[in-house]
C-alpha cells in the first residue's frame, strides 16, 4: 500500500558505499625472471617454487606453462632467484609493463594475453593463500579456499589494470560442505558409504571406515601436502579409509568433506513421491524389458556379484564393468549398431609394463604418416574402423600392408611373438569372462592375502589403479564443442613429487584421449579435439550391422577374424624390450612407490576435468523405437521446463537454489591488509565505477628486457623478448615457446563452471569477418571451441556479411573520448519502475506493478478481453483427496471469473470438473484446459508425469492446454490446505496468459507459450521521432519498440533458450538436448542456427529492428564469430544484432554504507527533503505551514465543494499509488572495461550493473551484470544505459509473471528462465 516517502528506506547511496575490491598500490613496472629446465624435468620447477616460498612466504613465485616465474613489487629489489641445486636455466630478465594488457590498434586481429600477466596473477593469489593457510587455518578446496569450521568457500581474483592498479576482489560463498568427522556419529562408523570429496583436489570417493592406524609412509604424504598444496595437518589426526572407484586408501579425516544435507540424514528417501500409491507404467515396462534381456544374455542379476570389481590376471586389466553400473547402456549399444564406441576405450588394453616404457621412452612420432593418418579434422567411418575393429586387417589404415611393410613383419623378433601370445591369452580370458561368470571366483583365489597389505593401501591391484585414473578422467560423454564454449579450463598442476622419490607418476589431470600413442604434438592436439566428444558417433551406414558380434556387453571390441592371427593394434605399435615385457607378467609388490603413485594421482587431480553426468537410461527408453523415445523424452523435458518457468514459486523445491556471494570475513580482510601493508585500500562503489583505463600504447611482448638493447624487441604482439641461456639454447624452445603461443585465460570471474579454453600449441591466429569487433579478441582454442575447423573458418572469411546494410564494415571499439564522456555523466542512477497497461471499467489505464496483486480488489480486467474455457482437474485416486480437489476447483473457477478472465465451464463426465486417475494411463484428450495435480516431489517423478502427458497428447483427438499444479497446494496428510487469494489470482492470470486468443487471427500461432497476456508494460511516449535518413547507424540505435531479447545458457548436454520482447507481449522458452540416446550429436552451431531461425520467425510478426543475444556465462571469441556468421542471415530484413554476456551471480559484492542506513548515495547529491503529505510532496516538496485555529471546523465541510477547473490550481494525485519498496533498482555504468575472464586481458566493450537491496540483509545488495562483447554503437555507455533500462523492465516482468520471487527479482525474466531451466535439466 501507499507509504509516505518520509518512511521509505534511503536507497540513494553515498560515496561510503563499500565495494569489496582492495587496491594494493600502483605499479608501472614489475621486474621479473623466468627459468626453464633443459632436461625437461618439471619436478624441479615445483621444487624450486616450494623452496623459494618456504624461505620467504611473501615471495612472488609461480610455476606456470613449463616455466618458473619470479616477480617483485618493491622498487630497487630484484626478483627472487632459483637455487642452483634445482638445475634451472635463466632465460629472461625483464620488466613487465601493465600497459601491454590493453589493445590499442584497431587493425589487430588478435589480442594475446601476455604470459607474464597470468603468471603474475597466479603468484599474487598464491602468496595470499599461503598467508591465509598459515594464519587463518584455511584449507585448499580446488582452486579456492574453504574454512572447515563454517564450510564457507573463499574466492580470490587478482587483476592488474592497464594503468598499473593492482586490484584484489574478494567474496565468500556459503556452501553445504562440512568436514567429515565433525559429527560424532561419522567417526563412529554409523554412516558407511557416505559420499565425500577429498581435499584439496576434490576427488570424489565413498567412506569405507575410520581407523586410528597411521600410514607407514606418513612423512611422504606430509611433505607432498606441504609442497603441492601448502597443507599442514594438525597434531591429532584421524584417518578414514576412502574408496575411489576401485581403490581404497587412507586419507586424513580433516581433509574429507561431506554434503551437509546427507550428513544430517537427509538422504534420497525425502525425494520419493508425495503419494506412494502411484507407479509410472513406463518404468515397469523398462524393468520388465531389462529382465528379459538379462535372461536371454545369461547375465547374472545378482547385485552383490555385479558390484564386485573384476580382478586382473597376469597383469592385464579387468574387462568387467565398473561397480554400480547396469547393462542398460550396453543393451542400447546392441540396438543402435550405427553408434560406435570411441578411442577412449583403447588405452585399457595397454599393459602396465608397456605404460612404464611409454612414460620413459623418448618423444617420437609417426613421421610422414602423421598427415595421412591423423591430419583430417572430419569424423569419418574409417576413424572408428581404425580404433574399434580390433579384429582382422581388412580395415587397417596404418599402412602395415603397403610399401613393403610385409618385410618388416618378417623381421619381427621373438619379442613380437611374445606380445602376440600375450594378446591371445588376453582374448581367451575375455571370452571365458563373458561366457562363464564363475571364472571370477577362480581369479579371486590368486589375489594376495589382505594381511600382507600395508595400512596405507588396502587394494594393490595395478590394473584397478589404472581404472581409477581412467575413471576419474573419462570424458566419453562430453560434447567437445559445447564444453569448450561453456566450461572453465584451469591450468592443472604439474606432476610432482619430492626429488628423492623416483617413480612413475600418473597425473589424471593430463590424461588425454590419445595420451598413450606417440605422434607429433600438432596431430595429437587435433585428435584430442576431434574425439573430445567421446562416447559415440552417428555413422549412417547399413554395413555397420555386419560387425554385430564384434562388441561385447562391456563396450570393448573383440576380434571378428581369426583369433590366432590378430593382435590389437595398440599392442602391435609398442616397441618394448625384454625386461619391460617380463615385468608385465610378474605380480607387483607392495612398496612405497605404489603408495606414492596413488597419493600423487590424488593430489594432481583436476576437478574441472570431471566427466559430465551420464545420461540416465531409465528415463530415456520407453519402447523399441529409439527415435520415438528420443522425441518423447525431449518433448517431456520441454513440457517440464514450461511448467517450472512460470510456477509462481510452486515448484521452488525442485530447482536447486544458488546462493549469492557474500562479503568476506573481517579476519580475511585483515590478513590481506597485513600482507600488503599500508598500500592496501578498500574501494567504494563510486570510485570503482569512475576508474578509467589509462594504459598506453600496445607494447610488444611482456616488456623490454633489462639485458637487451633497445630496438631488439622484435616479434609480434604478445611475444616475449628473451635472451640466450648459458648453454646457447634459445629461450624460444620448450617452455618459452609454449609461453608465447600457449598463453591462456584460466577460470572465469563469472562462475567456477564458466570460462575460457587454453590455446593449443602450434595454432595460428585466424582471420576475422568484416563485422568483427577487435577490441575484445583474445587468445582462445579455435580448434576445440569453434564448431568449424580453423582452416574452414579461414576459407569462410569472405562469406560474412555486415550486420545491416547501413552498418559500417568495421565495428568500432570504445575510444578514449567515449569513456571520457561517460566519466562526465553520472555513473549511477535510479531506474524508474515501469507502468503496466490493463483495462478498468472499459478504459485502458496504466499503473505500477504492485496493483496487480490486488487485481480483483480494484476491479481490473485483461486488456485482450475474456478467454472462456472448459476446466477439468485430474487428481490421484482417493476419497479424501477428491473432496479437496473439488473444493479447490470451485475456488479456482470463482477466482478466474471474478478477475474477469472469462466464463469457466466445468468438464468431466458428471459435470463436476474433477476426474480421478491412476496416472498410468493419463487421458489428456479432453476439451479445454486440464489442471493436472502433480503428486511428485522430485524431478524424475515430475518428468514421468510429463512423459505420460506428452504420450497422451499425440493420441488426443482435440487440442487441450495442460497446466500442472502440486498436490500440496490443496491437499495434505496432516492439515487442511488452501491457496491464498493472491496465489490463486496469480495462477489464474498465468493460465489466462497461456491460453491462445479467442480471435481467429493469431499473431504468432502456436510457436510461443504466452500470447495476448492480461497486462503488458505500458509503452511510454517517445521523447523524439527519429526521421533522419543516415548512411551509418546512429548511436541511439535502440529506439522504442524495436528490440527483441534472446537469452541462452549452455552445458555439456543441454542448451536452454528464451525469447522476449520489451513489453511482455511475447514469451517463449525452449530446451535443446545435445546428447540424445539415439541419433547424431548436435553441435553448438546447429542449435544456435535453430535459435536464430526462431528469432527470425518471431521477428516476422513484429517491427523489431534490433536483436539482443545474451549468453549466461562466458562467450569465447570463436563462439562470437559463429554468432556473427549465423546472424548474417537476415532474409531481407534490416536487423542489427547485439551480443552480450550476463551473470546473475557476479563476483562484485557490495554491502551497505557505514552509517547503518539501507543503501548509500550512488546518484550523488543531497537526498530530497521528505514530505509530510501527498499534496506537499507533489507540489512544493516541503512541509506545509501550520494552520491556526485547527480545532475550528472549516465551513467547506458542510457545503458542496465543486471540482476545480482546468485553469485553477489542482492537486497532483500521481503520487497516490501503490509502490513496492523492495522493487527499487539502481544502475551502475563502469567507466572502464572489465575483463571477461579471470586471469586474462580479454576486455568487454562496456559493463553495467543492476543493484537492489536484499530483503533478508538490508546492508547487502543483489547484483546483476551485463557486458557488451559486440555492439554496433560508437558510444558504448549510451547503449549500455539503454540496455540497463530495458533489463530493468524485464526484471519487473519476472516478478509479475511468476518466474521468480518479487522480493528477490534482480534478473530479467528471460535470463532467469534459462538459468532456471538449466538448473532443472541438470538434475535429470
Swiss-Prot record:
Q: Name one GO molecular function term.
A: transcription coactivator activity
Q: Where in the cell is it found?
A: Nucleus
Q: Which InterPro entries match?
A: Med13_C (IPR009401), Mediator_complx_sub13 (IPR051139), Mediator_Med13_N (IPR021643)
Region of interest (Disordered), ranges? 296-346, 386-455, 535-590, 607-631, 694-816, 1151-1198
| One GO biological process term | positive regulation of transcription by RNA polymerase II
The answer to whether UniProt assigns keyword Endoplasmic reticulum to this entry is no
The alphabetical list of record keywords is: Activator, Nucleus, Repressor, Transcription, Transcription regulation
Where composition is biased (Polar residues), the residues are: 298-331, 750-784
| Pfam name, any one | Med13_C
**Entry's family note:** Belongs to the Mediator complex subunit 13 family.
What is the name attached to this protein's record? Mediator of RNA polymerase II transcription subunit 13
To which species is this protein native?
Answer: Yarrowia lipolytica (strain CLIB 122 / E 150)
